[in-house]
Amino acid sequence: MKHYEVEILDAKTREKLCFLDKVEPHATIAEIKNLFTKTHPQWYPARQSLRLDPKGKSLKDEDVLQKLPVGTTATLYFRDLGAQISWVTVFLTEYAGPLFIYLLFYFRVPFIYGHKYDFTSSRHTVVHLACICHSFHYIKRLLETLFVHRFSHGTMPLRNIFKNCTYYWGFAAWMAYYINHPLYTPPTYGAQQVKLALAIFVICQLGNFSIHMALRDLRPAGSKTRKIPYPTKNPFTWLFLLVSCPNYTYEVGSWIGFAIMTQCLPVALFSLVGFTQMTIWAKGKHRSYLKEFRDYPPLRMPIIPFLL
């Protein structure tokens, strides 16, 4: 059985960083990364991007050496992705923050609204209902991160945790300040508006959870398998008939419901920014589905049925 020789060059300087002799033909890129780490321990596998061309796409960890368009002496180019952190850690951090930050404003801890309001309670029912909904949303997200989601990528750049936390924590503080303010004004149409908004919120939260469970069942634990998601017997998953990412559709719907319930401008802005970002993600995933699966359902749109 022939063996391969693998040289790894710096993608920027073309400097030879490592030479691997007698590499098995069936070795994966993940195994080559581990061998590279032995000579350069500062670059652990998650930091490494190996590619066939200095400006090309990163090879997948599961790619097999003998199936790549290389000879028995293969040249790979290395790029440092920077310090990495696990997706689970990032999600837990960015979701735990809003949960606790919101509660600080809800309980009106000292130095927020003035001494005479310390630890007082709002007289408006919608304020307490909003706290329950907000807390439920982020507790749900935390539990899904721990027990439901299966991540195709193990890590992301460390800098992302600061960007994500600034976004989630900042908006949580902004909306919580106004919703729990002693001078907060309840919704214009009173109980009817709150009940309608609560119904929207609850339905969308159930829908979002149902989609996450359906997506989880598509991917076996520990794998990166991708399949076309289809509706199940659960009615909340029937939205798969019309959109590629109904989890985002339901998520946006939840925040629209919360915005109607609280009639709070920061919540509306958070919903708008979230919708914009999720639309970008949904379009990317939709394109990926179309590219990977020739039999992908043609009627589906990325996030909004028939429109977007």
Swiss-Prot record:
Outcome recorded upon mutating residue 182 to L: In MRT14; reduced enzyme activity; reduced protein stability; no effect on subcellular localization
UniProt keyword DNA-binding present: no
Main location: endoplasmic reticulum
Post-translational modification comment from the UniProt entry: Glycosylated.
Cytoplasmic side: 1-86, 148-158, 217-245, 293-308
Topology of the protein relative to the lipid bilayer: Multi-pass membrane protein
Biological process terms in GO annotation: fatty acid elongation; long-chain fatty-acyl-CoA biosynthetic process; sphingolipid metabolic process; very long-chain fatty acid biosynthetic process
UniProt entry tagged with the keyword Transcription regulation: no
Alphabetical list of PROSITE patterns matching this protein: S5A_REDUCTASE (PS50244)
Residues bearing PTM Phosphoserine: 58
Compartment(s) where it occurs, according to its Swiss-Prot or TrEMBL record: Endoplasmic reticulum membrane
Protein name as it appears in the record: Very-long-chain enoyl-CoA reductase
Organism in which the protein naturally occurs: Homo sapiens (Human)
